[in-house]
């Protein structure tokens, strides 16, 4: 498909069109990616965020959260204390200490009384903190609030980690290492636990797939109605989960509209340009404008 920037209307007219589409929608499918959280102030590519949230690593020369994650991506015997020195802090500060971000607050106000379903690739817990009905959220990429066995010895067991995270964080020394006695271990087999994130084929996905059928059924049951695909901050890290399916579904549904809001990545295939509204701007600013008109 040929890409287009969809610049057929002014910003104000696009906001008006979005409001009308949302108000008249029989169903709204919302796709939330990393750009949504970035719009709320936590961008994994922003050096300023490293200085604010992870000064210990900024002092070591790291320029982004992505760069730090790359340095501690895999747990090994050699790096286990430093690995958890970072990941315990990351989960503590991103998942547990970060409050509900403004873009999510605004989204709640916009869609709370609508017929909606959410798919998110984020693991930061912001959709949970938003208070959305958990039966209307499909989050297949994992969650920072649970661990899984590194093997894994079970394909359906994950473990809540808040207390484990607290113990590790409290034990971190000046070398950014945890006390070895707090390394989390699998209660079933005794091997190491790791964050439950979709990194490879060892990911324990079953606990996150319970709403998959509901998500599919919601889409299919509304395909011939006025269905809106509202995509917020979805880029090309995992486009096969939200971005590409939303394009394909918009193309195949006679009354569908794709609303794509994303700073720097608000293009659509030319084939669905007439069925799309794209805004290349800060997501939260757009949501504020939408909220003013609803």
Name what the model sees in each region:
Residues 1-294:
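Conserved catalytic alpha/beta core of Sir2/sirtuin-type deacylases, generalized to analogous enzyme cores
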